[in-house]
Amino acid sequence: MSHHVHPYSHRLGIIRDWKSRWFGVNKQFRNYFKADVLLREYLEKRLKGMYVAGIEMERSEKTLRVIIATSRPGMIIGRSGEGANKLREDVVKFMTRYNLEQSPELKIDIQEIKSPESNAQIVAQMIAEGLEKRMAFRRVMKQTIEKVMANRDVQGIKIYLGGRLGGADM
């Protein structure tokens, strides 16, 4: 019997990059790793519904740079940058509350995804949002397929839905 390897690990270095980029030794490595995992979980909860495709972290000796890729940067940034400043303050509070390894300087960069229909993570969030609004699952799937296939970059789409949809077992 063979073991299954996650496809993401095969793509690393070829078409994908690491989600965290830093170097640490022994105890420092453990602290950095714990900080990255907890901070990523916190940001995913905090930014739920804002179509965040990915969160990357880069660490150097003096800075921690958090890169948030989203299709709706205006929702995160807010009016005149108020939302970004509030997010930065919340991250600093979170890191001090859990005694996480802190860098002297924290930078939060927000990248816009130009075509959200070609990003699988955002498409999945759109489907989940439609289902949470109690829309019919067949309609949600058909609308999503039409929306995604209208994008020229996309060659095809495969959607898998499971569970009790419409009150029936699937």
Where are these regions (language model features)?
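RNA-contacting regions in translation and RNA-metabolism proteins
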Residues: 1-170
